[in-house]
């Protein structure tokens, strides 16, 4: 009976312990990788989720009070803690909404006959009287910190250059007003009791000697053809830049152009429904028209046939006619209250009704929102009601992220990414489609360039090249992968892009001449006598091919201008421009070449290993049965290695999709939806790298960048999973070879 020696039993036990430890370590590593991927996914989702949460409106406080006089307007400070009310006697009252007390009041004018205000970002009010005069007032708040406490001090300031302006020389009572007023200019328009439309333009001129501003009031001359029914005028507004005046009648909307103290009628639009009132949307690039049937439509200028026209873009319908409306100060949101007491929060650009609920049983007299849009202040017959509004990301929806949106100033709906701009009234545009398109565009052109070269090189190196030459070629190509992509991107942007621009015909010609010349050289080599072919060792054909390709490249770059003169009138870029094809110096062609050079080592290494690893008995058996080398390659070797070759291409695609520095430095980084190889793009990865440092933590922009990262993560995961599934299928299919 045989017994194991003690030292052998010890070694078996030791081996068992090592196997157990390694098994646990391998399993733990696999589970850890999966857990890490899931944590990344969950973290991205946690940052993204708030942009798709529902809007909430919660009651915050109430202050019961009744006012004997009609309310003309209400407003508040930036945080919605103190409000003001202007009544038809010309008095303004300031109310502390926290302590529910009257803070102060001031008489601005006695019994005004007309009233208006500028957009909320200007905070100017105008009062008309029975003598044809207009008086201005600016209402605001001063913040004072006393002993660590924040105190709001109400302010009412007059327009110092003009205590009042005589708009009507005939001293007729004013019935309607429209106002636009800034620090350097302004326009006041008024209708009179005798049915006239009058206007005064306010201009400030700086005295070069004293540096003081001198204001002038200049009457505006109106074209009389459009002023035949002022008695039926319902509403009028002026844009803050003093360029346009909108007049609303029951079934007509007029657009007037103001220039050089003159006003002429630009266009008149017939309205099918009966209109009520005009309101400027935030930024004053759009005008909102209220209708008697409870609908609200947005209009803005578009250019059609090189002519600017006011166009109805979108319409919102409500359950009852609108009684109060308040646009947000900095966003395209609007608070709407109808006759039934329903509150609706809408975002005009995304065409979303964010919130709709019945909240009011009493008549609503006025509504306003502070600049931060975090509160809603409503004045009813019974007093003040304040609501907390949670609506941090109204501009984001599935449609705005993945669909076409019609933005102000654009002729039609489009996919647009533009997160920031220099002006305050800019509207962020967060469509990810241009970035996703740019990502796929860059990856596509990179694979078009790198795929044939890398796979062809892998086939030749693994199957045809001699082992002595392969020993030097393969490590040389593989070491290219260690080259930093920032260096490749720098060379592409600074060195390669100008070369391509100055030799565009030569570059395109080489894409045809190189493959054609290789086939011609191969054909000539094939028909040469056998004794000549035997002089060159097997697998060293590149010794002849490389000088030939270098010579063709030299001739093409030096004499490509002849082709350009013959076919393209001497300038290919100008010729393409005449055909409507744009050209950017840093374009997809440059990116394709540069990124292709970066992913060639990845594709080559995996594909070459797959081809070289095909069992020798398969190829030798095929050759022994009479097949040629080419037949053996195409019918045996490539089929067996196809799973590895496919994996190589997918790895190259994943590398191209996630590449950042090359795209960042070799393109113009313009988010375009254009497949033109001669124009640039912006990719998801490059966009994250560019904009993440400048985004505010927790802002819509910040979360949209995380959404872009999540899409990149999902796309890469999907491509890799699909590649693995196809690879396994190919492996099972050709296992029997």
What annotation goes with each model-predicted range?
Residues 59-65, 101-107, 162-169, 215-228, ...:
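A short beta-strand motif characteristic of beta-propeller blades
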Residues 68-76, 110-123, 162-180, 226-240, ...:
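Repeated scaffold domains used in trafficking and secretory/extracellular systems
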Residues 429-443, 497-516, 535-602:
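Loop-to-helix entry region at the N-terminal start of transmembrane alpha-helices
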Residues 446-477, 521-529, 723-732:
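Transmembrane-helix boundary motif in ABC transporter permease subunits
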Residues 520-530, 608, 612, 616, ...:
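C-terminal transmembrane helix and the adjacent membrane-cytosol boundary/short C-terminal tail
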Residues 579-581, 663-713:
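Interhelical loop and adjacent transmembrane-helix boundary motif
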Residues 604-606, 614, 629-664:
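Transmembrane alpha-helices
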């Amino acid at each position: 009976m045989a017994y194991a020696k003690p030292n052998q039993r010890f070694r078996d036990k030791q081996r068992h312990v090592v196997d157990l430890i390694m098994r646990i370590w391998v399993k733990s590593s696999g589970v850890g990788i999966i857990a890490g991927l899931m944590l990344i996914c969950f973290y991205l989702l946690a940052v993204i989720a708030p942009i798709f949460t529902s809007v909430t409106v919660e009651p915050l406080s109430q202050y019961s009070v009744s006012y004997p006089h009609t309310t003309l307007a209400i407003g508040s400070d930036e945080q919605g803690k103190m409000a003001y009310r202007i009544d038809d006697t010309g008095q303004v009252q300031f109310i502390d909404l926290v302590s529910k007390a009257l803070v102060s009041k001031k008489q601005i004018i006695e019994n005004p006959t007309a009233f208006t205000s500028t957009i909320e970002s200007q905070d100017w009010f105008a009062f008309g009287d029975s003598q044809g005069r207009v008086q201005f007032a600016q209402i605001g708040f001063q913040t004072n910190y006393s002993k660590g406490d924040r105190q709001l001090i109400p302010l009412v300031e007059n327009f110092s250059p003009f205590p009042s302006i005589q708009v009507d020389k005939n001293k007729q009572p004013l019935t309607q007003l429209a106002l636009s007023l800034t620090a350097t200019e302004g326009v006041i328009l008024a209708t009179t009791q005798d049915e006239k439309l009058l206007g005064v333009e306010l201009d400030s001129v700086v005295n070069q000697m004293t540096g003081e501003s001198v204001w002038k009031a200049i009457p505006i001359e109106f074209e009389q053809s459009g002023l035949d029914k002022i008695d039926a005028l319902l509403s009028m507004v002026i844009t803050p830049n003093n360029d346009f005046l909108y007049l609303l009648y029951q079934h007509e909307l007029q657009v007037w152009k103001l220039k050089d103290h003159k006003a002429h009628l630009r266009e008149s639009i017939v309205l099918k429904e009966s209109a009520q009132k005009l309101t400027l949307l935030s930024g004053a690039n759009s005008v909102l028209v209220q209708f008697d049937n409870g609908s609200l439509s947005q209009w803005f200028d578009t250019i059609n046939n090189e002519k600017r026209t006011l166009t109805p873009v979108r319409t919102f319908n409500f359950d009852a006619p609108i009684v109060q409306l308040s646009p947000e100060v900095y966003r395209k949101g609007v608070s709407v209250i109808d006759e039934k007491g329903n509150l609706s929060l809408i975002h005009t650009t995304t065409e979303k009704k964010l919130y709709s609920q019945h909240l009011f049983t009493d008549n609503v007299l006025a509504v306003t929102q502070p600049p931060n849009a975090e509160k809603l202040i409503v004045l009813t017959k019974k007093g003040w009601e304040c609501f907390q509004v949670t609506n941090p990301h109204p501009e984001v929806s599935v449609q705005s992220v993945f669909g076409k949106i019609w933005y102000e100033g654009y002729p039609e709906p489009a996919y647009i990414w533009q997160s920031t701009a220099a002006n305050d009234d800019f509207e962020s545009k967060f469509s990810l489609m241009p970035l996703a398109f740019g990502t796929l565009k860059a990856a596509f052109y990179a694979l078009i360039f790198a795929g044939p070269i890398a796979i062809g090189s892998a086939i030749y190196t693994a199957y045809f090249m001699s082992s002595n030459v392969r020993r030097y070629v393969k490590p040389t190509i593989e070491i290219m992968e260690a080259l930093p992509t920032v260096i490749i991107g720098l060379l592409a942007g600074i060195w390669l892009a100008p070369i391509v621009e100055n030799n565009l015909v030569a570059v395109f010609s080489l894409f045809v001449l190189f493959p054609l010349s290789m086939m011609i050289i191969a054909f000539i080599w094939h028909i040469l006598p056998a004794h000549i072919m035997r002089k060159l060792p097997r697998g060293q054909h590149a010794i002849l091919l490389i000088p030939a390709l270098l010579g063709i490249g030299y001739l093409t770059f030096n004499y490509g201008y002849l082709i350009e003169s013959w076919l393209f009138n001497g300038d290919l870029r100008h010729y393409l421009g005449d055909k409507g094809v744009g050209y950017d110096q840093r374009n997809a062609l440059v990116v394709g070449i540069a990124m292709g050079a970066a992913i060639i080592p990845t594709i080559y290494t995996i594909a070459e290993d797959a081809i070289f690893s095909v069992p020798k008995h398969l190829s030798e058996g095929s050759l022994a049965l009479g097949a040629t080398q080419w037949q053996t390659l195409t019918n045996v070797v490539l089929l067996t290695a196809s799973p590895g070759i496919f994996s190589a291409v997918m790895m190259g695609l994943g590398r191209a999709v996630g590449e950042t520095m090359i795209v960042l430095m070799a393109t113009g980084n313009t988010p375009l939806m254009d497949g033109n190889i001669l124009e640039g793009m912006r990719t998801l990865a490059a966009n994250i790298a560019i904009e993440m440092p400048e985004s505010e933590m927790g802002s819509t922009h910040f979360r949209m960048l995380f959404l872009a990262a999540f899409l990149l993560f999902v796309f890469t995961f999907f491509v890799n999973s699909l590649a693995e599934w196809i690879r396994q299928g190919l492996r099972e299919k050709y296992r029997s070879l």
